[in-house]
Amino acid sequence: MSRSLRKGPFVDHSLIKKVRAMNLLEKKTPIKTWSRRSMITPEMIGHTFEVHNGKKFLTVFVSETMVGHKLGEFSPTRIFKSHPVKKG
């Protein structure tokens, strides 16, 4: 079930505060965050985020095509090792 349109997208308050401060100062340093649930908004375009995947921080550069998705979608938490190949 998707989020109600009247509520709008969820973005962590501390994260949006950091993005707005960076926009005012016109700085583009990476923003470290644990908020994988935050939705990417148009004002985040061009910023670099370091999103935590449970073990380490993965670098995510936000582009126009990412708007509307969540930050966690771009930092996978599981590593798939291929199935073993049977010899014989």
Swiss-Prot record:
It holds the Pfam family Ribosomal_S19. The keyword Cell membrane does not apply. It comes from the Bacteria. GO terms for cellular component: cytoplasm; small ribosomal subunit. Keywords: Ribonucleoprotein, Ribosomal protein, RNA-binding, rRNA-binding. One of its GO terms (molecular function) is structural constituent of ribosome. PROSITE patterns: RIBOSOMAL_S19. InterPro entries: Ribosomal_uS19, Ribosomal_uS19_bac-type, Ribosomal_uS19_CS, Ribosomal_uS19_SF. GO terms for biological process: ribosomal small subunit assembly; translation. PANTHER family: RIBOSOMAL PROTEIN S19P FAMILY MEMBER (PTHR11880), SMALL RIBOSOMAL SUBUNIT PROTEIN US19M (PTHR11880:SF8). Protein S19 forms a complex with S13 that binds strongly to the 16S ribosomal RNA. Belongs to the universal ribosomal protein uS19 family. This is Small ribosomal subunit protein uS19. The gene is rpsS.
